[in-house]
Structure formats: structure tokens, C-alpha cells
Amino acid sequence: MSQLQLLRAQDYPRMPWKNGGGFTEEITRDSGEGLDGFGWRLSIADIEESGGFSTFAGYQRIITVLQGDGMRLLVDGQPSRPLLPFDAFAFSGESQVSCKLLGGAIRDFNLIYAPQRYRARLQWFDGTSRLYSSASTVLLFAASSHVEVSMAGREVQRLGLYDCLRLEGNDELLGLEVQGRFCLIELISR
């Protein structure tokens, strides 16, 4: 049976960005210290003004706007589509990236992972969803103030805004019924 850990948003450690231009709240990671050595990491960042992103050589990134009007990224000189809330966008951590805010400040959600160590899948859902996963690590990130997660043989887990449920060591098909707006992240070791 998988190990379950409920992570509360008010407990996330706050740390400076790698480039020093802002702050990140780290939700969880697989291992490593500081800004190096992890195989994957989930975080939330507040972007108050347009500017450059940190580089993460050897990593893949998936970013999603959570709050605010959105942003447009410039990735290695190529403009992205406008990134609006709950519209995920992937890019290489090695890329030179800057953002242009479409309005005021935004809050975003980030998955950074090492593709040579993990395969990753990230999807957003809203409403009632019945899901099945055989990934060794499953993360459910709550993007609304009331998210309920039901699993066979376990009590219902209630998540508040930006809380995260981490299910680790899954060795069989995991069935979940989830109510609310949330992100499902599946990570499989290579």
C-alpha cells in the first residue's frame, strides 16, 4: 500500500529564486538540498513584475498560472501563447526564458523534473473525477478551497487551497475519486 502524506500550504518553506529575483514556496520534492540534486520538485511562485526566469540545466519545467491575468513567455527568443489560469506550458529548464505579465502580479505553479530520471505527466481537473494511476509517485494539488479525495481502504482526505496530497511507493493500480479543482501529477522513475 502506498504511503500517504498530506502537505498543508501554510507549512511550505519560502526560499529565494535561483536568480535572486523573487521567492518560491516549495511544496515538496523527491530529494536533494537547496536548488540542486532533486529529481523532481513542486513549487508555487509569486511573479510581481515582468522579467527573467532562473535556468535549470538538465531539467524539464511545466508551469501553470494559478492567479492573475496571466503571462506570455519568451523561450529562447520564441514567444509562447498567452498563458492564462490553469493552462499548463512545458519548456526546457536550460532555455533562456523571460515573462511579460498580461496585467498585474500572478501566482504560478511549477513542476521541475529531471527527464533522464523521471517520466512526468501533469493534468488539471475541475468537478468530480474518477482517476486511475500506476505511477510510483502521485501528487494531487488543490486549486480550490475544498478538494476531497477518496481511495479504497482509506479515510477521505480533505484539502484546502494549495494543499497537496503525496502518495508514494504505489505498486499497484491506484483508484481515486476527487471532487474540486486540482492538478494530478504522476511521476515514474526511469
Swiss-Prot record:
Disulfide bonds: none annotated. Gene3D superfamilies: Jelly Rolls (2.60.120.10). To E.coli YdjR. It holds the Pfam family HutD. InterPro entries: RmlC-like_jellyroll, RmlC_Cupin_sf, Uncharacterised_HutD/Ves. This is Uncharacterized 21.2 kDa protein in hutC 3'region.
